[in-house]
Amino acid sequence: MNATTQTRFDIEGLKRVFEAGDVDKVLEFYSEDLEHIEIDAGAPPSSPRTSDFEHLGNALRGAAQGGIKLRMENTVAGGNRAACTITCEFPDGRRLVSNTIYDLKDGKIVRQSDVQVTDPE
């Protein structure tokens, strides 16, 4: 692959496996050297929470096992970026909504940046 060739990112494929709760298939969309950044009430922009591929996998498995319903909407992809809105609905009715930006390299997600808000308990 030369420098001008880009691998197209299948955001709709990611949406399908994400909403189906197929964690192993979701993780195939990610680079193993992922940088995951989360900004929320407990982790402001000046001090965001950061994690890696393994942590993301554990979080997704926990969501699937905990009965959390996941939706991915407003998907867009182009060039070396993709974005979406993710909604997680917890069994108690609370919701988390995240605006997510994916940075891509060679068709894989290398950085995921989430700005999220959760219903109060």
What are these regions (language model features)?
Residues 23-77:
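A solvent-exposed, acidic/Ser-Thr-rich amphipathic alpha-helical stretch
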Residues 33, 77-82, 102-110:
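Short, solvent-exposed coil/turn segments at beta-strand boundaries
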Residues 17, 65-66, 92-94:
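Short loop/turn motifs at secondary-structure junctions and domain boundaries
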Residues 95-121:
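Short beta-strand edge/turn micro-motifs at domain boundaries
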Residues 84-91:
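Short beta-strand segments that buttress and anchor functional surface loops
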Residues 1-28, 32-33, 121:
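Short, low-complexity N-terminal intrinsically disordered segments enriched in polar/charged residues
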Residues 72, 80, 92:
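Ligand-binding pocket scaffold of soluble enzyme catalytic domains
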